[in-house]
Amino acid sequence: MSAVRAVWNVLVPPLIVGVLFVGTWEIIVRVFDIKPFLLPAPSSIWTTLGDNWSKVWDAMLITGANALVGLLFGVVCGVALSFVLMRFNVVNELVTPLAVALNAIPIIVLVPVFNNMFASTTEVPRRLMVTLIVSFIVLLNVAKGLRQVSATHMELLHSYAASPSEILRKARIPNAMSYLFTALKIAAPVAVITAFVSEYFGGSQNGLGYGITSNAAISRTAASWGYVVGACLLGLAFYLAAVLLERLASPSQRSTHHQPTNQQSTNQQARGLDPGGATA
Amino acid sequence: MITRGARRAALFVVALVCVASLWEFYKIVGPEEGAEIFGWRLVPRSSDRAMPHTWEMVQRLFDPEVRGRNTPIWRAVLGYSWYTFRMALAGLLLGGAFGVALAIVMARFKVLERGLLPYVIASQTVPLIALAPQVAAIGGNWDLPKWMWVSSLGAFLAFFPIAVATLKGLGSAQPASVELMDSYAAGWWRTLVKLRLPAAVPTMVPGMKLAATASVIGVIVSEISTGVRGVGFASLTYGQKATSDPAQLYTAVFGAAALGLLMFGLIVAIEAIAMRNRPREATA
Amino acid sequence: MSSPEPHTASAAVVVDGVSMAFNSGRPNQVDALVGIDLSIHSGDFVSLIGPSGCGKSTLLRLIADLIEPTSGTVLVNGKSAKQSRLDQDYGMAFQQSGLFEWRTVRKNIELPLELKGWGKAKRQSRAEEMLDLVQLSDFGSHMPWQLSGGMQQRVAIARALASHPPLLLMDEPFGALDEMTREHMQAELLRICGAAQTTVVFVTHSIPEAVYLSSRVVVLSPRPGRITDIIDVDLGAERDEDTREADLFYKKITEVREALRGAEGQTSGPTGVRGVEDR
């Protein structure tokens, strides 16, 4: 099959579905004369977005900054913690059941707590929440990568009388790297989601989440959807950045070999998300 | 096995005690009004208003929710949590059913898979939860009870992880087994029931775990937009009163924790049942 | 070379002028098989042997109606291959045992019977009978992953024979087993199939295996696969461990080996005799 034909096969069906979907939406709204405050037509969302673009963009920057800061700190904390857990078994035993429990709990409800402890007028509570959630995702995955080196590799290194630190450098860390990228691809969109869901729980009145709820509350639905579009774009951008980072860091590496260990999030990536496609 | 479970439970309790101790320790050591680093309020306030004592939190559970009434707050919070749990469970079941159905349809008609799958996958990178207020707005207009809308959003969020995982699982049957069913002249649907679905179960289980947490969060967030009185709503309203009644907020947090653990327990039980008689995955 | 094949109505399998080309008409067309004429009689044990890529597995799948030939016809039990498959006239076994990991051994054996619509009592009694036959009566309630490779293959064979089909198609079923287990399984297979007079078509790339098991060995050339030789192996109906050390056994092995080497010379393909074991 030629390359052109292959690309055609991949692009055309989703394009057709997309066009059909938007078209049907538009038609239904017009034919049934659905009130704009209920469900706006795609065309009106588009025009409102055009009018509002600078506001949406500003909100994207704010939420995006929160997500980015939280993501960076979360990755650093997660990685650091995973090393500590690997080194000190006592800490591992204590932290792991806690992590499992926290995995189950919707800790987003802690945002008001943070608002209380820190200043609710700054972005700190939101960034802290993102950091927390991202740390757990990264921690669970990287710890697994550091621990689960293939038995064959371990035997080989032992036969070379490698010291623990050499084993760390030569086997564990490279193994953990691919897990790190898996975690990153999950954590990036989760950071965005957490950032703006945090905004629903009060705090300063800016950002995408605030834009969505405030506009929805006063029935300016088309404007509200505009912020939704902004949120989708932001989430997609973060995910693509993570994929790009993975490709740049190690062109030959595929993080597709294993089951990701996931923290809670609103939208998770199943294994099929990696463009490389292959699975464990 | 029993001793391992007991040990884990004991360690969990120890871990909780450690966390509580750290909390109290910080209260003693930390600055009352917090502190700023590089202009950011990074060091939290340790006043009793901002960080109640752990025993105050526990004690608050037994005080009434609203002054003058008799019911202690733990009852109210339990009621909220149970309500949220039921909505999340309904959402999980509904979303799961649709997710499995869609996966089967996509497995049957490859054309549909090519058209829809990119969207299903992309939906997991974009924040669908942004639609919660919209759904609430639409729902507010129709006469259906509000909790159904909240459940629907949970279902919407649970739908995608399960659809993706199921589709992957349906394709994971061994080629030799598929040929075998072919050699028995078993049709597509019989092959689905006897081979592909059972083969898909190990892949579906992680998807179900994700869907469960997604549904819970979807429901909690939707409560805020719709005003349905579950544990999400409670944390928001208590949070708004945090300056006058700081410990109250933490009761809602405990409620949310209980809800999460209950859902987690349910999923673990389902996993154990679904995966009995299957070979254990080898772990290092 | 072979003697001319009489087409008789009692022939279990008749392959007539069959060719198989994949991606036919496109630039990447692959001619897997060309001009295959083969007649297998009821009760025969026929091995298909040849180097990797010679199309022996393809030929087996054509007989099984898992794929359709580009030209020519395949008759099984006097019917078209398709009708045979729909009537479930044969049992099949692969290199991977293909057992369902979520079913017990017993339920795995019952699978074809379920698909045939048998009642529960009838299924269970037949499954017990098959377990007895392959000497795994104690393992009926076990899960497949609890069994060794050889035992799993025995279950696969029991499953393939569960409905007592007249024809058994096997694609390198012992390929993944170690040598000792393999020899043992070969003896078991002869015992089981001999008792029921089952016709067997057996794909292998091991010369000793083909000679030990078969009444006839069909030699295929490298791609595009043609039948270059059919060697009669008259080691008798009763074969056991002593057979492996008989002079005739070695003589037949040499005959097959030379036929394979000769086949290599006849092909237009680039490769030599690869993928054939001398063990």
Language model features: what each stretch is:
Chain A
Residues N141-L180, G209-I212:
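Short cytoplasmic-facing helical segments at TM-TM junctions of multi-pass membrane proteins
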Residues L128-L132, S165-S198:
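Transmembrane alpha-helices
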Residues V69-A99:
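Transmembrane-helix boundary motif in ABC transporter permease subunits
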Residues W8-V31:
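N-terminal signal-anchor transmembrane alpha helix
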Residues N116-M117, L146, I193-A231, R254-H258:
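Glycine-rich helix-loop "coupling/hinge" segments at transmembrane-helix boundaries
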Residues V100-I137, K144-G145:
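Generic hydrophobic transmembrane alpha-helix motif, especially the helices
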Residues A3, V31-V75:
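Periplasmic/extracellular loop-to-transmembrane helix junction in inner-membrane transport proteins
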